[in-house]
Design a protein with these regions (language model features):
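DUTPase catalytic domain/fold
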Residues: 1-159
């Protein structure tokens, strides 16, 4: 999109590049409203209004050309999550190398009030990740103990 913002790293040592919201006033943005029905909502001069418990696909205006053997991982920016209560619907977005459509950020409002995303606002961050070729094999035997772990959730570090 001509109005999209090229992703960039915010600092010299930033692990991820920032992704911004790309829309114009009047654009229709896809959302799942409180009624749980998919609908379109228009962006206004205040931005995109995301009410509590609503989910939106925020456009970035970007189409990524991801090399084969890589993926892009997408995370919500910590300030957006902490200050606004917005999260990614799937916690971490995974963009495969064969996806060649516009990138959208799937955002949910977990706060108790409406939140607004502004045009050009940095809402997510992403990184290019090299994939490790993995072969999955079925086995009928449980793996042997590798450490002194004896249980699951919250069990390590206890005597």
């Amino acid at each position: 999109s001509p109005s999209s913002i090229i992703p960039k790293f915010a600092t010299e040592q930033a692990a991820c590049f920032d992704l911004t919201a790309c829309f114009e006033i009047g654009d229709k943005i896809k959302c799942i409203a409180q009624s749980q029905n998919e609908t379109l909502r228009r962006a206004t001069d205040r931005g995109i209004a995301i009410h509590p418990n609503e989910r939106f696909l925020i456009p970035t205006g970007l189409i990524l050309d991801i090399p084969q053997g890589y993926c892009v991982e997408v995370y919500i920016r910590s300030g957006i999550s902490y200050k606004l209560g917005l999260t990614l619907n799937n916690c971490v977005g995974i963009i495969d190398s064969d996806y060649t459509e516009q990138l959208y950020i799937s955002v949910a409002n977990n706060s108790g009030t409406a939140q607004y995303i502004q045009k050009g606002e940095r809402i997510a961050q992403a990184k290019l990740v090299k994939l490790v070729e993995t072969v999955l094999e079925e086995t009928l035997e449980r793996p042997g103990l590798k450490t002194d772990r004896v249980s699951g959730f919250g069990s390590t570090g206890k005597n």
